Amino acid sequence: MWKTLIAACFMFLTFVSAAAGQSQGSEKTVLDGVYSNAQAERGHGFYTTHCGACHGNSLEGVSAPPLMGSRFIERWREGALGPLYEFIRQRMPFGRPANAKPIPDGEYLDILTYILKVNGYRAGESELTRNLLGNVVLVGMNGRQPVPDGAHVVTVGCLIQFGDSGWALSNATEPARTPEENSATPSSVKTELGTLRFRLADLEAVPDFSPSMHQSHKMQAKGFLTRQPNAERISLTAMEMLDPNCL
């Protein structure tokens, strides 16, 4: 009996360890080789056909912004590849007639991998697929960093008043990039508080939101981040109460 119990415990621990390894392995960045060379080569051809006239054959930018270098990376880093892919798929090429023949989603995906290659991110063994876009984060060559100034972010903290009419989030979490349309999720309700503080601007941009009704509540704030020493702030696009108690 004891041998059976020990064997069962060993199998359980092995399963848990494997599951944890799979979970950690699913969190990737573009530094991990998330596309293949063959995929990027296809993307080169599609890019030349659909994008080169505006963005330049070397992604240097002509009538449209460059798709390589620090300016491009700063705009998108610390976010998943999904929003970048959707931006390209839904809006590019700019000015394309509505009745034009649709560009296959796979071509857009290959173009994205070519952009990654030109920006210096190494290829791997497997192709990038659409179901992986939400699990791969675009980062600079120095790895994960705090989100940049101007990014649309989400943070969780306690709503407090300061001065006569100012409002802020105290004990706030480190901001993370988020699409503007995302709403609160059960996981955000359970988010542990942090140590940061952000002033809140443009409260009037949030429909039907009265800050005095949510004082000392645990809130999720979304908006555009301004990095400024001792005066970091978020220009709000959304506010949502997560818990009436901020503990």
List each language-model region with its residue ranges:
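Positively charged n-region of N-terminal signal peptides that target proteins for export
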Residues: M1-T4
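Extracytoplasmic electron-transfer domains, predominantly the class I c-type cytochrome c fold
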Residues: V62, M68-A123
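Short linear capping/connector segments at secondary-structure termini
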Residues: K28, A64-F72, L128-G134
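Bacterial N-terminal signal peptides
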Residues: I6-S17
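Conserved RNA-binding domains used in RNP assembly and mRNA/RNA metabolism
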Residues: Y108, L112, L128-L247
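Electrostatic cytochrome c docking/interface patches
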Residues: G21-F46, G140-D149
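The canonical Cys-X-X-Cys-His
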Residues: G43-N57, I111, I115
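Gly/Gly-Pro-rich "capping" loops immediately C-terminal to redox-active cysteine motifs
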Residues: G33-A40, S58-R89, S170-E192
